[in-house]
């Protein structure tokens, strides 16, 4: 990763186009996935807490092992925070109450997490993704993406404004905060834009590109670590 005081243009490009932009999306999707696990258990008459524990425990162990070769990786934190904020919701039988808790908890924790950045955005975004699925929004927006399209009228200028603020504050004490919130707004814009594009002739193209990536996301994430380590050894990079 280019240093802040060297490769300046590359550093700025990565900060504006990649860093903090997609991690929130992945976290949000994990939240949706955990809601699907609970929903599947509920439909089959199985214990939702048990279903969550069976998924989260292996993820926690895998994340802990992955930390040994990739310090700072996300899986351990996904599992730990999911145990902390999502697992208790499996015991909330009133689904209206469950959705409400996840929604407001997600909003508050994401706002707070944006202030601290890094792994601290995980709890709120897991809850927001969970609430998103519990409200049935993935199916609703797939049928009619109009709300997502309309939200772009707010999200696009917001993302641009916060990105501009991020660039203006680069090198100052405020940069960390503007960069975090710019990343969150950018991620929200990408989600809304994707839903909009999925109702266009690009749907088949996007589906062909993203569906395999979604199915292999965990495999690719783990494999990338070993590819990077192998490449570094081959090139003699410490």
Task: Put a short name on every predicted segment.
Residues 1-238:
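Alpha-helical transmembrane segments and their immediate juxtamembrane cytosolic regions
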């Amino acid at each position: 990763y280019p240093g802040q005081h060297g490769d300046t243009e590359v550093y700025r490009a990565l900060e504006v186009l990649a860093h903090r932009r997609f991690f929130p999306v992945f976290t949000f999707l994990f939240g949706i996935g955990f809601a699907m696990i609970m929903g599947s258990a509920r439909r089959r008459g199985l214990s939702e807490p048990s279903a969550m524990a069976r998924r989260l425990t292996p993820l926690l162990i895998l994340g802990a092992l992955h930390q040994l070769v990739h310090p700072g990786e996300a899986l351990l934190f996904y599992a730990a925070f999911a145990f902390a904020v999502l697992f208790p919701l499996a015991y909330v039988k009133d689904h209206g109450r469950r959705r409400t808790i996840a929604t407001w908890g997600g909003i508050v924790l994401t706002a707070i997490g944006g202030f601290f950045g890094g792994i601290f955005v995980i709890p709120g975004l897991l809850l927001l993704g969970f609430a998103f699925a519990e409200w049935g929004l993935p199916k609703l927006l797939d049928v009619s993406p109009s709300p997502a399209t309309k939200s772009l009228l707010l999200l696009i200028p917001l993302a641009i404004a916060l990105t501009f603020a991020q660039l203006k504050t680069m090198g100052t004490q405020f940069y960390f905060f503007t960069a975090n919130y710019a990343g969150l707004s950018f991620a929200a814009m990408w989600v809304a834009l994707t839903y909009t594009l999925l109702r266009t002739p690009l749907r088949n193209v996007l589906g062909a590109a993203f569906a395999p990536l979604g199915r292999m996301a965990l495999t690719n994430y783990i494999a990338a670590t070993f590819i990077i380590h192998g490449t570094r050894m081959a090139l003699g990079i410490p």
